[in-house]
């Protein structure tokens, strides 16, 4: 250790101890680390809260911000918390309050917030403390307004002032403001629009703005500090609602004020007014006589131009100064303004002021290019701003600017606003008539409103190709022009097909708002600022026409369960940071909040990340622990893991696999893979899209979309043509990713899982504070600590109640003694000179203590009545029973556990809900079949590859000959090719024309209604481009048959063991190696001694044995051997397995068919050309189908025109091989028969279905019996 030389001193230092700096730094760092760990970053295991969360909740309770009361401004909750419990700045406190109010952050929110509390994307919550300057005008009812700083006269800095004031919200509706907040002095900024409208407020004051969000124009709140030049703010311009007749005197006073401002003068000893308009002059004189009265002089003179100028002069201003016009005395022109009394007046009074003002110094004119304009000029910048603001109160939008040096103009510069001025305000007399003539003379098609909704036209035209009817209607008109919507809204809306788009555009174009472009945001220094508390959902109010709002909060009912009975000494309290008040060390927490809502935090050298869980499941686990409190740790862990299935995130989503869950629950640490929910959809144009309806927990919605767009741009994500956010508060998350036509949906989805946060991991680290020390806990340990805490709470609560009951019983026993000796007590009290003497006497008389004696002396005379005496005796009896019950609770642990169970059951039933997050299996994990019920379903697969499964009970069993029930609605020329009943656990093998085989469990097919088409298998399986289904086979297991036989168009056949095709590869496997220009035609299951029948397109057929000697088994990656040879223009049409007592039924393109007994086909050697099965006839056409049937087999056929026939094989004439067949159906001109197939519903156990074919001429399938001929179309 280095020697230390102490500096010379004056003897005032009593003692200095040398300390090793390394040891001191180590000690200080450990102290700091533990302070952060215990005091800030980690939750307490008992209530699951960090100190700041606990303090916010307790401060809100202590301040009365409870769920049964109105919301309180968030700043009040923050101020109470910071002032009494948490002196670490308001930002962290407000962030905590906001998070506890966000339903996407907490599974069970503890704060009920109103206002803008952010979003799962990049939208931040509104700031806690935001205000506007004192001169901001707040809109009131009936056109009145008041400066916010004048609402409460003499309001103190940083004060909350109760008021009862009706203001207007963003929609122009009256709402109640019950508090004015004087927020002290703060730095302010002024937002000015290009038109000249201004609002001054703090940087965190929110204004309603029009923002482009993913190409959609959206109304969002932005802070003044976030607003930039070029942004668009929203101004409310709904004309005021007027009520009753105007006050005549006030109206005349306003008229006279407007006249003197525009055409008069008022000196200290002389006032006057003049005008060339006699009607206007007369109106002003009459107003003067009404308002002022007294002596005045009227004269006239001829001007240089020859006009008559009428003049009013007043030389005695005594009466004038008694009126509210006295403020004009000695006022310079540059200092003129609208006085407060006029702002406080209703719209009828303000209208009179504006009419007189514009009649005096206002002008209307038609400029070049048919532009009509109204203007007003003044030397006062303040007056120009006031006039512009007052016009806006009437719904008139104007521009204000400096015209020349020291001259300011207010201009109404387009026809729509001129018409609004003319209907809502108007000139006084003569000029109004001129304005009417000018408006009438203009063509209705010129001078229209230039007010548009920025970005609306682009948004509309972008969706023309897939969402709109009559695209040209939106390319030829100014659909973003508000005035165009005003005149033609019904016609425009009629062209819009999508209801969500209709809602967006109509809300923006209904005329309530004006979208003003921001010109500048400037620093306006430090000044007093104010805000209002408005008791509505969005808390909006109008200031200078801008739309402002605030956030408010109160505790949720579930948060009250966290704080329940905290006043019954259930937890320990400690002094706050300055010793003034007490705060709880932990909350009673009547439900397991740590696991229900989870927690996250980063401390020094450690971090916690506990996922949220389902309250029902947690309660079930707690109940087991209460009933089996003496179980060992291993048994308890297994039991709670059986009941708590896994995390349950507020944003739902999927958990992939259970290994990470098991790790987290068994060791306290684990990586849990989570995934969003994606559905494959196909629109009316056949385009495939991936639709994301749920995102993983804590994934930022906006950043996720941006990430996809960026990776598509850089080429990392392929196959995506468009990404669109269609989500809203109404529909929730809906991100539509449009897939390119040549892309495979499953491949794109897998890439999204790999390269984006559509699949991510939640790193569980179940670390919390236990007895002041951080510990990593297993699931069962967390639940046990919670149970121990609840047992302690019950003991402390019961002890408190027992003490209070004993105190009450003690007093009642004294009262009963007094009532038994009532006369003696009354005599003693009357004889006592002082209360103290009476108290001592009562103690000696009744043998009681001072507490009982005082209660007797405090007893009211009315309690001496007989009924009251009996009530005291009854109360004592009840309390004695209660004391015995409370004592029993303290004596019996099983009763305490029962109370916890009953109270938690009540909470879970009241606030619990179903699990949101589903757990799915992965390879090597629990099989999906363990999670899916085994049930019978109907599987439907169409010719073009659409597949679905349907519950069997949606189809009713019918007798033969019934009409059936409506089945799938299909596209033109599509038919149901495969239709069978199977178990949800059965395998379905899809063989494609390219020689590959894919498999899926029946439950993996989309479940759909009878009438739904389903989804294309290319979206369910990773089909390659151009692959089509050649055959579908259903098996329960790979032991159902020994062999699988495949046949190609070139006549090759291959027999392989069915078990060779048992593969887990999601991308399919090779079923047969195809040679050039060949494709797979058929696939059948075959026994070891079966026979095969091959039929060619030209009518040749060959039957041969499939024994191992005739057709040896081969591996999958082989081409097979020649099963049938063809002439040059022939090919294989079908592959069939021969069954006894069956027929080969063939059909031709001309609509002819026949059936031939299978015995007529001789056994031959493999590889020949076979024998003739039908005689070719040009009129009858070529062969289109050949299937093996029995007499009762049902079959159907479809034509190129969409016609369909359904009949039984018995109705088709039996004939020999070398015949042409008979007519199966009549064909229309140009129609041909496309295909025949056995009716797949034969295997559906009585299920009957009617297949719908879009645009088909025939929509009916008929069952038939032996006495019915086939129906023809």
UniProtKB/Swiss-Prot annotation:
Heterotetramer, composed of two GyrA and two GyrB chains. In the heterotetramer, GyrA contains the active site tyrosine that forms a transient covalent intermediate with the DNA, while GyrB binds cofactors catalyzes ATP hydrolysis. PROSITE patterns: INTEIN_C_TER, INTEIN_ENDONUCLEASE, INTEIN_N_TER, TOPO_IIA. PANTHER family: DNA GYRASE SUBUNIT A, CHLOROPLASTIC_MITOCHONDRIAL, DNA GYRASE/TOPOISOMERASE SUBUNIT A. The keyword Isomerase applies. GO terms for molecular function: ATP binding; DNA binding; DNA negative supercoiling activity; endonuclease activity. DNA supercoiling is inhibited by fluoroquinolones; IC(50) 1 ug/ml for sitafloxacin. A motif (GyrA-box) lies at residues 958-964. Pfam families: DNA_gyraseA_C, DNA_topoisoIV, LAGLIDADG_3. The lineage of its organism: Bacteria, Bacillati, Actinomycetota, Actinomycetes, Mycobacteriales. This protein undergoes a protein self splicing that involves a post-translational excision of the intervening region (intein) followed by peptide ligation. Residues 42-931 form the Topo IIA-type catalytic domain. It is found in: Cytoplasm. GO terms for cellular component: cytoplasm; DNA topoisomerase type II (double strand cut, ATP-hydrolyzing) complex. The active site is at 130 (o-(5'-phospho-dna)-tyrosine intermediate). A type II topoisomerase that negatively supercoils closed circular double-stranded (ds) DNA in an ATP-dependent manner to modulate DNA topology and maintain chromosomes in an underwound state. Negative supercoiling favors strand separation, and DNA replication, transcription, recombination and repair, all of which involve strand separation. Also able to catalyze the interconversion of other topological isomers of dsDNA rings, including catenanes and knotted rings. Type II topoisomerases break and join 2 DNA strands simultaneously in an ATP-dependent manner. One of its GO terms (biological process) is DNA topological change. Its EC number is 5.6.2.2. This is DNA gyrase subunit A. SUPFAM superfamilies: GyrA/ParC C-terminal domain-like (SSF101904), Hedgehog/intein (Hint) domain (SSF51294), Homing endonucleases (SSF55608), Type II DNA topoisomerase (SSF56719). Few gyrases are as efficient as E.coli at forming negative supercoils. Not all organisms have 2 type II topoisomerases; in organisms with a single type II topoisomerase this enzyme also has to decatenate newly replicated chromosomes.
